[in-house]
Amino acid sequence: MNIYMEMNKVKTSQLNNRLLSLDILRGITIAGMILVNNSGAGSYTYAPLKHAQWHGLTPTDLVFPFFMFIMGISTFMSLRKFNFEPSKAAVWKIIRRTILIFAIGLALGWFGKFTSGLSQGESILVAATHFDTLRILGVLQRLALAYGFAALLAVIFKSKYIPWIIAALLVGYQLLLKLGNGYEMMEQNIIAIVDKAIWGVEHMYKDWTPGGERIAFDPEGLLSTIPSIAHVLIGFLFGKLIVNNKDNHTRVEKLMIWGTILAFTGLLLQYGGPINKKIWSPTFVLVTTGFAAQLLGLLIWIIDIHKKHKWSRFFH
């Protein structure tokens, strides 16, 4: 996952032309994940380290989408060696990686149930066979599906069509949310309905509503994977922007401009579709990819242009 850049342009590895700044952004994101996952419990957790209960955005809500944005950039760089063609080698690599990440996510979910069962005094056999209540989806599964579909779209369609695909995914998803109670935290939410129909309640995450009721609602649901595919594709386009523009100043300028456009558009449209991580709303996609692009531009300006990188060794 390391990324190397050089000179006043950007230190690059000969094969992938990756930014050191991107590596630092990934490191910051991973550090954020560690901090959030070890932030305490309940009232002992600082408010900025909590997810928004429903609508809204906290610093914690930026961690997952930032990682997905970085994954989109890395996907562009990874697929360059296949010339973005749907060759057998490219498709097989995408499918293999998707299955592997998804399987790891399932395995971690199973292991959590296994250790929980042992701690409650269950036998090894009983603790190891709670498949009837194993959660199918999750964070790694979301990453796997978003990467897999986005990467396949990237090799099937020319890059000039990607913005249209992103728009279609986000607009189509917005219509589903509007028509299916998507912005309401309740069992009749279309996201919950689809997951119940496909997986069953036993295999879903149980979340708390703002009113204090616990219902079957998966924040990494199958339907809300649609906008996350668009999320990765936006990162993919920023990967193209970075590679096609060799001058660091140009990179910073374009990252800041497009990042501001995305963030401003998302903030403006939130009055018609609130920013919401748990349903991965279209405005959430726009705002978080915009912020991620701006942060990457800032890091390039600090690290690669002004060579202020001693502070970043912790994240490298």
Feature-to-residue mapping (PLM):
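Alpha-helical transmembrane segments and their immediate juxtamembrane cytosolic regions
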Residues: N2-H316
